[in-house]
Amino acid sequence: MAVNYLCICLSPAIDATVRMDAWPTDGSIIKNATDTFAPGGKAVNVARWLAKRGASVACGGFLGEDNVAMFEKELKRYGIEDRFVRIAGSTRVNEMFVTPQGSFKVNRPADGGPYKGLEGLGSLEGFDVVIMSGSLPKGWPDDTYCMLVEAAKKTGAKVVLDASGKALVEGVKAHPDVIKPNAEECEPLIGFVPKMPEDFKRATVALKAFCDYPIISDGGTGCWFDGEFVAAPKVEVLDTTAAGDTLLAEWCFSGDFRLAVAAGSAACTMPGGEPPNMELVEKLKESVK
């Protein structure tokens, strides 16, 4: 039976990647940088991978009217149902700066407009899985995800929450089915940052007070799925923008731990959140432990 997915992205972003030949020094002028721009936001990245895998997927949230065309084109390209509400202004631009010596990212706060309730998102009925992912727009209530999780659960859907900070702390009060914090994001919930394998196992047990199934990302090392560790394969990293989102999307689609980690690693080889080739994902899965 086909599964219908809804991805909720309250904080979409245009992901700009700037590549430079060298790490800039104080006062330096970079003359030969290249840049790329791609529509993104965590739940948009999730929706894109689900669509690439052939799933029936809708994506909703709030988009600024001034630069909405890039998102409309991308959603149409992947056959994703567009449920975004258009608001005045522009969608934020996040920037990743990449050099041979390292990289860093600048994330701007999302502006979803003044909070006017969640009715504008439309009905959550008719979906089997609802995935809520990303930060909240500035000025929005910390319990926004809590309200959304409650609303989605009333429809009978499986609810996945990928958030951090106060949005996560408040969101888990509605007990989503799945959460996906990284190690640092666990601390506000359980009081410690897992570092060693026994820490992650203890964290998994503690997180079950807030959800049925915790997934804990350990960055480039790998991922813990309900206490079971899957190591990430080695790849040449180009851009980590959509790695965790692709991992989550693949797990939601197939439930295959190894394939999910392989998909997340493959995403690191692609620019600007572009989905990786499925052949690469399958090849990487062979080396996933």
Label for each model-derived stretch:
Residues 1-60, 69, 234:
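Glycine-rich phosphate/adenosyl-contacting loop at the front of the ribokinase-like
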Residues 5, 55-57, 82, 159, ...:
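Hydrophobic anchor at the start of a short beta-strand
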Residues 26, 51-129, 284-289:
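Conserved N-terminal subdomain of the carbohydrate kinase-like
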Residues 48, 93-97, 222-226:
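Short beta-strand scaffold segments in enzyme catalytic cores
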Residues 50, 182, 244:
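Short, conserved phosphate/pyrophosphate- and ester-handling motifs at nucleotide-, phospho-/glycolipid
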Residues 105-107, 127-135, 162, 180-183:
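Short beta-strands and strand-loop turn motifs
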Residues 142-227:
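Conserved phosphate/ATP/ADP-binding segment of small-molecule kinases
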Residues 209-216, 233-288:
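Conserved post-catalytic alpha-helical subdomain immediately downstream of the catalytic base
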